[in-house]
Every structure is written in structure tokens, then in C-alpha cells.
Swiss-Prot record:
InterPro entries assigned: TAF10
A GO CC term assigned to this protein in UniProt: cytosol
PANTHER family listed in its UniProt record: TRANSCRIPTION INITIATION FACTOR TFIID SUBUNIT 10 (PTHR21242:SF0)
Subunit structure of this chain's protein: Component of the 1.8 MDa SAGA (Spt-Ada-Gcn5 acetyltransferase) complex, which is composed of 19 subunits tra1, spt7, taf5, ngg1/ada3, sgf73, spt20, spt8, taf12, taf6, hfi1/ada1, ubp8, gcn5, ada2, spt3, sgf29, taf10, taf9, sgf11 and sus1.
Subcellular location: Nucleus
Domain of life: Eukaryota
Pfam families reported in the protein's UniProt record: TAF10 (PF03540)
Name the UniProt record assigns to this protein: SAGA complex/transcription factor TFIID complex subunit Taf10
Annotated family: Belongs to the TAF10 family.
Protein's gene: taf10
Amino acid sequence: MSDINNNEPAENIEQPKQEPEDGNNSMSVDEQPETSSTNLPTGDNLAPMSVESPAHLNNEDSPKSDDSRERHGSNYVIEPHLELRDMAKDKTLENFLAQMDDYSPLIPDVLLDYYLSLSGFKCVDPRLKKLLGLTAQKFISDVAQDAYQYSKIRTGSSNASSTTFGAQNFGAGGASGIGSSGRRGDRGKTVLTVDDLSAALNEYGINLKRPDFFR
């Protein structure tokens, strides 16, 4: 019993020795942030000047930028212009379709309905059908004008070659003179050939030329 009593206080003595050691370690850990905290104030005295000054400048610049935007009206001028342009396009299209009620295209409605149904296009609005007929009419007129220009170029080159040939045979009489007078009457006429039409359609990506034949 005496031995047990002697051991118990010894253990009790050793435990407080360990506790202060742990306490000393904890104090050493706590002292490190204290030393860092003591070092920070010296840096904090300088840091606020460098950090807060741009913040104040940014706060001062932001209202100025807003004021400049309001003065220039960038938020209120650019966007409405875009919307007005879109509205103007829609308005012109509506007015154009309204004018199609009184318009009768050169292409008959029966022929237009036939080719639209043949291509698989279904539409109930007659104004849209007339608009498609007008575009087809415009396309045909452009192709005809281009073909006419090609025919003029072709006839001009052929007339130049015929005049040189006629100058060489000048002085021949009789039936040759009668034939030449008939040809002179045909010079004022323009004849559109398939070659002229194929050359005009080739500009629009349509090829009408016959494939080359090889034996």
C-alpha cells in the first residue's frame, strides 16, 4: 500500500511536467502569430496607402464614365438606331406587299401556280406568289439583256469580217448586187441564238452548252 501511494504522487508529478511542456509548445505556436502580428502593423501602415488609393480612384472614375456615357448617349443612341433600321426594313416589306395587290405580273397566275406546285412550293397568300413572279420576270429580263449584248458583240465581229470580204469583191454586178441589197436589209435585225443565251446564263451558273462528243 505504501508503494502504491508512493507511485501515485510520482505519476501526478510527471503529468504536470508534461503539461507545461505541451503548454510551452502551445505558447511557442501562439507567439509566432503574435510576432507576425507585431510585424504586420508596420506593413499595414504602408499597405493601406497603396491599396486604398486605386480603390478611391476606381470609385471616382466609375461615375465619370457613367456620366460620359449619359452625355454621349451611347446607351440610348446606338441601340435605337439598330431597332429603327430593322423596323424600317419590315415597314418597306409590308408596303411593298401591299402594292402587290394592284400589280399584275407578266407571268400568268396559272403558269406561276403550275411551276410552284411542280417545285413543291405551297403558299396561300397571292401577294407572295406575285412577288415570286416579279422576281422571275426580273431574272428573265436580265438574262435577255445579257444575251442581247452577246448578240451585238457577235454581229459586230461578223459585220467587220463581211465588210473586209465585200471590199475585196467590190465591182461584181448582176445577181450579186441584188443579194447584197437583201442582206443589207437584214443587218438591222438582231437574232438571239442558243450560243448567246448559254453565254448569258453561264454568268448565273447555268450551263446550257452541249457536252462534248467523243468517238
